[in-house]
């Protein structure tokens, strides 16, 4: 079973079983919480060309909470990290009306990051809090920009989604996908499972094991957990094969 989005590094877990989020402002993994295994694990600030992170899959981006005070400074580093094979997604980036810089600044920072994702052909992990309208505006802009430049629009995945099925339908109609954390709308879970579209499960920053999140979701759906695991597999059509 795959944990689609986590901030907690645990080196006792199979490296290919989770997507570890790293903020581009952090020095490697030093800003992350250790959830088990070896404490104090860290990555170098500048990843060398042959860096593979021991098989761990990464998403790297600038969180909207950290867009104040010159977000542009971090984009060269993000562009470099985005080229690494172990970085399979860009993010989390996005919009949050409750925290961070002004919405205009957050939108500019997100525009820059989704453009990087389009150039390297990798999906985007999106943080969105009470900014659905603005997110839809950016998605529309993004598709137009990609088409005009000959890029393939990449999938955006809304992580930690707590909205209703109607919201999920709107997002999915625009080429986005949904990832559910430990708190979600049960009707949305049922809709995602029955509609046939890909979706994902995640731990984010909670210490509940991903196995428990899958177990609870399978009980609520009334299905065997193996069926759920097969539905939440990002390697089918989202992530590129990792070659190093």
Feature roles, as predicted:
Residues 1-244:
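Mid-domain alpha/beta scaffold segments of enzyme catalytic cores
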């Amino acid at each position: 079973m795959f944990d689609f989005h986590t901030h907690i590094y645990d080196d006792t877990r199979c490296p290919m079983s989770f997507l570890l989020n790293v903020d581009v402002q952090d020095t490697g993994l030093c800003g992350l919480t250790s959830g088990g295994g070896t404490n104090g694990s860290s990555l170098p600030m500048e990843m060398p060309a042959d860096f593979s992170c021991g098989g761990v899959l990464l998403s790297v981006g600038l969180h909207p909470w950290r867009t104040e005070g010159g977000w542009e400074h971090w984009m060269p580093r993000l562009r470099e990290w985005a080229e690494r094979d172990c970085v399979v997604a860009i993010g989390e980036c996005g919009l949050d009306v409750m925290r961070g810089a002004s919405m205009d600044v957050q939108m500019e920072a997100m525009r820059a990051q989704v453009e990087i994702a389009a150039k390297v052909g990798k999906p985007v992990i999106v943080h969105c809090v009470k900014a659905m309208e603005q997110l839809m505006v950016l998605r529309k802009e993004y598709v137009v920009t990609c088409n005009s430049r000959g890029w393939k629009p990449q999938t955006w995945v809304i992580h930690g989604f707590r909205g209703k099925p109607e919201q999920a339908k709107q997002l999915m109609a625009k080429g986005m996908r949904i990832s559910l954390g430990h708190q979600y709308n049960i009707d949305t879970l049922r809709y995602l499972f029955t509609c046939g579209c890909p979706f994902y499960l995640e731990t984010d920053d909670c210490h509940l094991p991903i196995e428990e999140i899958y177990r609870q979701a399978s009980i609520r759906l009334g299905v065997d957990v193996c069926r759920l695991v097969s539905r939440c597999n990002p390697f089918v059509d989202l992530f590129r094969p990792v070659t190093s």
